[in-house]
Amino acid sequence: MSCCGGNCGCGSGCQCGNGCGGCKMFPDFGSDEKITTTHTLVLGFAPAKGSVEGFEMVAGAAENDCKCGSNCSCTDCRCDPCNC
C-alpha cells in the first residue's frame, strides 16, 4: 500500500527512509523477534527508461512528504488516506 510519496514511516519506531510505502512502513520489532537478512542477485538488464519519466516521479514524490517530528510524531504530512 502506498499512501505517501515522502520519506517517513510513521510508527512507534519513528523510522525514516527512502520510498515511503505508507504509514508504519517499517515494522516495530520487539526484543524477542528475530531479524533476518536476504540477498538478491539480479541477472539480466532491462531497457533504459527516458529521463523525463524519472524526473516526473521524483517531482511527484516531493509534493507529498512526511517528516518525523519530535516524540515520534509526523509533521508536514499530506498523505490523506494515511493520516499519519
Swiss-Prot record:
Superkingdom per UniProt: Eukaryota
One Gene Ontology cellular component annotation held by this UniProt entry: nucleus
Pfam family, one: Metallothio_2
Alphabetically ordered keywords of this record: Cytoplasm, Metal-binding, Metal-thiolate cluster, Nucleus
Tissues where this protein is expressed: Expressed in leaves, stems and roots.
Localization per record: Cytoplasm; Nucleus
Protein name, entry field: Metallothionein type 2b
